[in-house]
């Protein structure tokens, strides 16, 4: 027997709540009011109290029924009805004074019952219009229906679940109670609600706690955005996984040679011209522990993957040649690694060369906050030679040490998730993708969603070219079975069946299309103040490029002095030279603005900036740069005058003429040149001259414009 409230029990026994409370007090059970909850044993005791009374009542009713005068037979009743149809008003008149007389109560009740019976018979006769046909027996009038027992309430559930909100009707259904009862409870709590009104979480919890029912809210997970889903594994399910290492550095400083020396294979000889052409992922075993290496072409692929939200690298090995020192791409690699917040191990390569000077390299790297441990810093430096394999063991030991310090762990006993390292279309096998498993275990036959495409893993090949049936965390494998070629940096996830994988992939493709059509989200000086005002911006990331090192230093120092409340200027990269595609790639990944001082973006950089909606600001006066950034941060930016490039020409030859000066013989490579055009003379990405054209001639004739032939 379940628990009941006092009023519910009273309703069940068809007695007032006060009567039940009185009975409980007689039983020495204290209750405060009709809302008090009765335990199952108390309900049972009350049942015993009420059973005898019920029996007596039934006996009394039976006695009363026997004492009543005999009802007339059906035939007599019909005759009686026929005779009295016309004397209805007289009978009514006779009945009135009967009430006034002080007759005894018992007789009065008998009379009223007889009168009610007569009325019923008269009404039945009137409906028929005539008395019953001769020879046919009239059915005896139905006996009074006994009062129906109280409706038994459903047992309360132990727990209910809901998603978002519930209406009063829905909550009542879940609790097995009438909506009116829920509305009454809400009213008692000071909440006015109708049957179709939505209830918030607090109201649902209050009602359920009053009934003693547990509440659980379901959280809807958008599986299409599985990159954002963070599955928290139990600590006992986590096991140690191999570290994922990326080797970065300047051209010809020995990145691939170093990896080749570690793997004991001839990767460099297979590459065209000894330069890495694609991203390769390899796994090596050191002291019974595995290390996964990603061999990237410079740092572009690293940044591309990071721009897509794929943080795959655990440790960055920065390769610097001992005879060459810190170069522009070395600085870029440092900035990329720092922006990704990845620990750096510096590998000073080529120490076997006579002109090698490792101490100079260490001194140069201190300018970029990479201080060696032996000099009191926290950066690990390894001196080695990839050619002679000197110092390799020390480097590998340091990788394992950093890995141990980082406590890299993953759960292999779940559906696999990870990142695409590279992808291509093979003529024989179709779309092929190199995947890096970051958690879970990938098996042959698993339904998989990769980026906006899907498929079923048909075959898996490891870095040695051998077929494998499953891949564990930090293991790179090449898979086939996808419907389309994904992009490098795309995330993948395994689902329960191919049908669901297809639905998720289609939804992701649709969402990507909508995002491409939507308004740009990249930060620009025009909408900077709006983003600051809305609290979206806490840091303003800038990439600074200038014509000379002195200008770079002066510009960086001036920009860092800008003080606007709530926003900090952060220089993520500053270098000498033209604005390149690599700068745009870094700006895309870091949501930064590119500032060019006396330099211009090359053609590829322009195209990339337009495609990725990166804001490039070009200036020739430092004061103007500072003023523009400060004004943008304070929301006082002047309207921008857009510069339209109508053509480009290449200087093929120069002629010096006295009294005139230098004449440039040009070949139009793009668009056209007009006589009233303003021109810039750019040499190796640096603006040498800016002004107007004095004269424009084709052969000896004065030409209004010069177009591409």
UniProtKB/Swiss-Prot annotation:
Residues 385-387 are annotated as: G5. GTP binds at residues 249-256, 295-299, 349-352. One of its GO terms (molecular function) is GTP binding. Residues 47-70, 105-121 have a biased composition (Basic and acidic residues). InterPro entries: EF-G-like_DII (IPR053905), IF2_II (IPR044145), IF2_N (IPR006847), P-loop_NTPase (IPR027417), Small_GTP-bd (IPR005225), T_Tr_GTP-bd_dom (IPR000795), TF_IF2_bacterial-like (IPR000178), TIF_IF2 (IPR015760). Residues 295-298 are annotated as: G3. One of its GO terms (cellular component) is cytosol. It holds the Pfam family EF-G_D2. Residues 125-137 have a biased composition (Basic residues). Residues 138-149 have a biased composition (Low complexity). Keywords: Cytoplasm, GTP-binding, Initiation factor, Nucleotide-binding, Protein biosynthesis. It comes from the Bacteria. It is found in: Cytoplasm. Residues 249-256 are annotated as: G1. Residues 349-352 are annotated as: G4. Belongs to the TRAFAC class translation factor GTPase superfamily. Classic translation factor GTPase family. IF-2 subfamily. HAMAP family: IF_2_B. PANTHER family: TR-TYPE G DOMAIN-CONTAINING PROTEIN, TRANSLATION INITIATION FACTOR IF-2-RELATED. One of the essential components for the initiation of protein synthesis. Protects formylmethionyl-tRNA from spontaneous hydrolysis and promotes its binding to the 30S ribosomal subunits. Also involved in the hydrolysis of GTP during the formation of the 70S ribosomal complex. This is Translation initiation factor IF-2. It comes from Geobacillus kaustophilus (strain HTA426). The gene is infB.
